[in-house]
């Protein structure tokens, strides 16, 4: 790829509660290890959100921050980027706000961005703990940590990211986690997810048309060891 790859970390001051920015760091690292020029753009709430990124990231956050974030994202920059071939990775609150609606404080229901056919409602008990899935993608087991009160249901046909082996995932009764479309991978997995799951990180990078099939193997044994340790810890 001749041009610099742009990784856009959307609204980190609002959606950066659980250290999910580590996903952005690991994407940049994996590109740099392959000699692929890249830059991370921390797109602040006080700036115009860029529409020319290659990869976008939405992290987790608290209720009021999530509401503020979805209002800022209604400006269409993310939507335009996805239409132009960008890829989005979204975690927890970032996952929820991509749907039709999600719950907020004071019993409010907030309209989402309608980028995914999902709806999230408040539920009890809160889902907290290790989350282990078998991915629906050809990358094996996925490991992470979930911490969410919302329960997410699909409102139309949609591929989950993983089938839950341990934990709750999207919904207490449905035993799946996240969602996958041509432009979006979403999950409830913190960890950060792309640090714990190097195969998922490379799969995500490979989805961009300019990078597909061009990612050579790299020395990342420390991340593969972390993945194996976290999977083994759930057994």
Give the location of each predicted region.
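N-terminal beta1-alpha1 cap of cysteine-dependent amidohydrolase-like domains
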Residues: 1-83, 195-235
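Amide-donor transfer/coupling interface in amidating biosynthetic enzymes
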Residues: 2-3, 9, 122-235
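A secondary-structure boundary/capping signal
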Residues: 11, 91-93, 116, 148, ...
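Structural motif
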Residues: 55-59, 89, 188
